[in-house]
């Protein structure tokens, strides 16, 4: 992106009002930072080709080019994330360790999908994979280490902090999300899990979309497979188990995220499925019959028996939000996905006129192929596919 497109005052202080810097969120959507740790012991292994670190009692074993200091910056259900220096390139990276990555087939498939998708994509607003670190020995391949470009924080951390955000910040974040999403959708891919913690940021407000483990093709009919997208950002067609879904599901999520950014609290913080649907109808109103054409008869019956809600006035409910921003959000938060604004339509909306430049909003040169998922892969096949990805980054390693 042309640096000139950036608003002049988007240099951002560290979240948390000048105290501890925010967690350097890795592409795992890592949560809060684990704090700086000094004197982490490093031991060379496998004839000096690898280096082992002991972090939180976990062995972190990477190729020897990743030099100290290595710092834990996040922890999640998948494992641990550390920042490290690649001594060959001089670049700081975020390394995610996925421990026992092949124990659960669904998780292994998610890891493989994320690797293949991110290797296919090349865009300023999508986090890049820098390395898949091969195991010291192919026959004992259990843990997967993925190195991503390192970012300073994520949108969830910023929203929770006392970091002041100007209208220009929010506008610029929205623009970058849509710019990245245009590229993703052009590759025939739906992200399906957009939320603030999957939007990484650095101090000069560059934004990158991460976590493609739930991504799917836009033409897929096998609907709810492994579908666990965060409820608060879920489009109504997903809440109603619609058998068909489109790129419009991601647009709904972006509308929710933008309003959370403006309001500093989630727009629809549903406690469960039913509560989620109720919250969104309380704001945008009960849909009419024409808006329900896309859902099945069971879902239509269910909605008809719910208490009816009139649409609330967005300008009255959110008086602090710019009228053009309200207009765009209302077009994103449209119940019927067929009527919802597209990513291209959103980029061309007057609210983003100062940033929009169609010649600098690239699309993907070729659609992504999910063919590798067409057949049930064994654990060994998945290991081999990920191992081959590692060799692509490390051609000298055999």
UniProtKB/Swiss-Prot annotation:
Induction: Induced by hydrogen peroxide and abscisic acid (ABA). Belongs to the protein kinase superfamily. CMGC Ser/Thr protein kinase family. MAP kinase subfamily. Residues 1-26 are annotated as: Disordered. GO terms for molecular function: ATP binding; MAP kinase activity; protein serine kinase activity; protein serine/threonine kinase activity. This is Mitogen-activated protein kinase 1. A motif (TXY) lies at residues 225-227. Pfam families: Pkinase.
């Amino acid at each position: 992106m042309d640096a000139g497109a950036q608003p002049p005052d988007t240099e951002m202080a560290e979240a948390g009002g000048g105290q501890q810097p925010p967690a350097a969120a890795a592409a795992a959507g890592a949560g809060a930072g684990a704090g700086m740790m000094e004197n982490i012991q490093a031991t060379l292994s496998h004839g000096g080709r690898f280096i082992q670190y002991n972090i939180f009692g976990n062995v972190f074993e990477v190729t020897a080019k990743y030099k100290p200091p290595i710092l834990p910056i996040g922890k999640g259900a998948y494992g641990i994330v550390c920042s490290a220096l690649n001594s060959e390139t001089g670049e700081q990276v975020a390394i995610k360790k996925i421990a026992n990555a092949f124990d659960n087939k669904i998780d292994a498939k998610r890891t493989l999908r994320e690797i293949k998708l991110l290797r296919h994509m090349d865009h300023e607003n999508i986090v890049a994979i820098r390395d898949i670190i091969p195991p010291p020995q192919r026959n004992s391949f259990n843990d997967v280490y993925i190195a991503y470009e390192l970012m300073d924080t994520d949108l969830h951390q910023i929203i929770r902090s006392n970091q002041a955000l100007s209208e220009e910040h929010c506008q610029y974040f929205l623009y970058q999300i849509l710019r990245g999403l245009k590229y993703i959708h052009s590759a025939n891919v739906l992200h399906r899990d957009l939320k603030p913690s999957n939007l990484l940021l650095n101090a000069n407000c560059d934004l990158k979309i991460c976590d493609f483990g739930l991504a799917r093709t836009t033409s897929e009919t096998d609907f709810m497979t492994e579908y666990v997208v965060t409820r608060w950002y879920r489009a109504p067609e997903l809440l109603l188990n619609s058998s068909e879904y489109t790129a419009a599901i991601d647009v709904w999520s972006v509308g929710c995220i933008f309003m959370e950014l403006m309001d500093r609290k989630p727009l629809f913080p549903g406690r469960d499925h039913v509560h989620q649907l109720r919250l969104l109808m309380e704001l945008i109103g009960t849909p009419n019959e024409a808006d329900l054409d896309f859902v099945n008869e069971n879902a239509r019956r269910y909605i008809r028996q719910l208490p009816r809600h009139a649409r609330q006035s967005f300008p009255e409910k959110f008086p602090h939000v710019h009228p053009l921003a309200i207009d765009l959000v209302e077009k994103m938060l449209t119940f019927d996905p067929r009527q919802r604004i597209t990513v291209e339509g959103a980029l061309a909306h007057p609210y983003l006129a100062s940033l929009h430049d169609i010649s600098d909003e690239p699309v993907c040169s070729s659609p992504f192929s999910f063919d590798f998922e067409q057949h049930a892969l064994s654990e060994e096949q998945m290991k081999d596919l990920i191992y081959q990805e590692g060799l692509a980054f490390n051609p000298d390693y055999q």
